[in-house]
Amino acid sequence: MAASALNLAVFCMQTAPYPLPYPHSPQLLDKSSRLYVVATDAINDRADVVTVATLAGWLARERVPEIFTVQKAIDDPEDSNAFWLRQLAGEYGTINTTFLADSGALLAHFAPRMSGYVRFDLDSKFGSANAAITRCSAGNGLVAAGTAATAALLESLGVPLQHDSTKETASAAFEASKATLSDRLATFAPNDGSKAHCMAGYAVFSRSPVIEFPASGDAASVAVIARLNASTHAGVAMGWHSGDEFEYVKALSRGGAWAHASDWSQDLYALSNLAAHSNALARPRTTPPRGLPLSAATHAHESSAMPGAGRSERHAESRPVQAAHTVAFIMSDGDNLCWLQGDWRKASWYGSPDRGAVPIGWTFAPAAAELIPTVLEWARRGATVNDSFIAGPSGAGYYFPDAVPIDRRDAFKQATGQLMELSGMDLLNVIGAAPAAEALEPLLASAAVRALFFWTYGAGYSGMRGNVAWLGGKLVAGGVSRSGASQPTSQVPWSGRRRLCVC
């Protein structure tokens, strides 16, 4: 979902191992590791931040993550990058600030391991930065250089020019390089280079092509999605669209891929490679007491110094009133990795001192177990008895189940079930155009899914008007209203598909 659409919605396993699309470094971060920290505010030109990011990406791909970026300093309380770095301190070896304010010295330090550089023009409107990042993704030991000064520095260090992408389009770079690019990951970013510094590191790490998805798509983005669809397994799109969310997610869904909103995410090449946290977050799920609302499923509280710690006594567990309606409050946008890495931890949201006063369901990307396990672990450690985590939307990632080709639905079910098990979640939030039973049944068939909340795209997520249904003995509940949104005037059409049995 779009980061700007933060909404509070009101509502009246074991799976076979699935080859997930997320890569890992040959060596994960552990106590023997060393992370060089670089402050991006100390870098004068944003193009040089892209250079550092591409360096960080192939270092993580080659051996182990060795670079982590913060805004100013590692002790900055407002900088979320620095906050997550502090969570790693001690558990993942040495935090080295030698190059904190000297990215040139950082390049000199790693120059002997570089094979070349790719020149780009950050001011190009035709995708020069995306083209250069794609070239670095496809190659080995390459960094992208966007300024004459950085190019000159690299030349002086004995790093040769490998390719000039200053006038190259992102589409041309993709076509020329796709033989050595991933066929399961793609990164979508504006061709004007405005977000190139964010996902460049993870793109290079994952060998992902980088290209724009404009409003309604174009031939270049169609070609990238078609390549994902040609893979044997489901794919994933990182970054975000540049125009129309519905068209973007629909195109990905039809192409057998899901989206992770991550256009402003940074340091994923490091955060996704943690030995102590990765794939170790699943917690035994306990059945709530009889009659307890699904949204109030409890989690064992752990002692922690983070927001929410110690409040399980202050906020008593809510008990339902007999013969009354049950209302569940669910916070949207937890699929947005940028938000989870950023302001979500702060006092306006999960870090609120009032959190825990009432039961709240927090949508949360179950893929966090693979991509940002430290964020998920931090959230769980700080959870009160009134906090529940709900996978989605729409499971493995953001997609429309009714748009997924029939021959891909089992793959989405398997990936969703596996990620829900890894993240310890058993409630699923789905967004779709229409609640078609045949599209939801595969997801509900997963042993990992206990119940499903369905939000319609449009109509304030509430096109089902609070209706409920039972599929395979599992609850499907539709949203009643969205905080701050007008009430829907009509239900979403069923598009001629088999209707849910509405109770």
Residues covered by each model-derived region:
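Terminal accessory/targeting
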Residues: 1-364, 368-371, 475-503
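Catalytic alpha-helical scaffold of carbohydrate-active enzymes acting on polysaccharides/glycoconjugates
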Residues: 311-429, 435-454
